[in-house]
Amino acid sequence: MQTLAKVLGVVVGVVVLLLSTIFVFSTQTLNKPIAYADASPPIPRDSTALARGRHLSRAISKCVECHGNDLGGQVVIDAMPMGRVVAPNLTSGRGGIGGSRSDDDFLRAIRHGIGVGGRPLVLMPARNYWHMGDLDVGSLIAYIRSVPAVDRELPATKFGLVGRVLLVKGDLNGMFEAKNMDHTAKRPPPPAADTTVAYGRYLAEIGGCTGCHGPSLSGGSLPGAPPDAKPASNLTPEGIGTWTEADFFRALREGVRPNGTALDSTQMPVRLTREMTDLETKAIYMYVRTVPPKPFGTN
């Protein structure tokens, strides 16, 4: 009996040590500060800027997909023991962060995916938003500041045991875009808003097209998505090369492919892309037509 008790004691001790090690190292991974360099642009407060900010939050950058139509936040993923990901309440209401965050805090979160204290934010598409020009990011921040306060207290983002093991292994690095960015890179000025390839590329970047469909737009598995999630489609000429401009408009506004089948609205936010202007939709179409053909998933 004494021998059995000793063995059990050793086993319990090893398990406790292992769990403690996983917790310590995963916490370090979650909270390791990231340095960045960015000049804060002026924040416009006029009605034109607020309208642009609202448009960006919906039709282009789609902030409302995660933070909710009222920007009051919501649980995005609830999959314990893997983890729970929560998009915070961005307003100044009870449970919101709007009242305690500076304009610089919002800028750092949007363009760099970095939160208070330098910690990397979870599932923040900063590699796309990094491209956002000063006027656009300023307008977006101004709009976020202007929305009515929402009283909504939410649980914190949390990783369970399985998630923490994967954090230590580095398997979840794709969920933290701030870790995979050059935060000192020089940002080119955005092109003028026009039906041009350059403006289409800009919109595809800040709109997250390249975030889901990949840098080359050839599609594939979605970053941070569960293994059983449907892959993003190939948007290169290899995938939609036969689509006309009218086909492209119909897909983004009605959620219907040229063959009449429906796009999956749970993955393709047609309710938001339909709010893009004709100019914006045409510019993106023009850009998509110029990318090199690529086999599916070859980014």
Regions found by a protein language model. Give the residues of each.
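N-terminal type II signal-anchor transmembrane helix
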Residues: M1-A35
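Extended surface/linker regions that mediate inter-domain or inter-protein docking
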Residues: G9, G13-F23, M132-V197, Y287
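C-terminal capping alpha-helices of c-type cytochrome domains
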Residues: F23, S102-G115, N128-R152, A246-R257, ...
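Electrostatic cytochrome c docking/interface patches
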Residues: P33-A59, N173-E205
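Interaction-mediating elements
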Residues: L50, I60, H112, G118, ...
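The canonical Cys-X-X-Cys-His
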Residues: G53, I60-N69, L140, G200, ...
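Detector for the c-type heme attachment site
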Residues: C66-G72, R111-H112, P125, R145-S146, ...
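Gly/Gly-Pro-rich "capping" loops immediately C-terminal to redox-active cysteine motifs
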Residues: D70-D103, P120-G133, F159-L172, G214-F249, ...
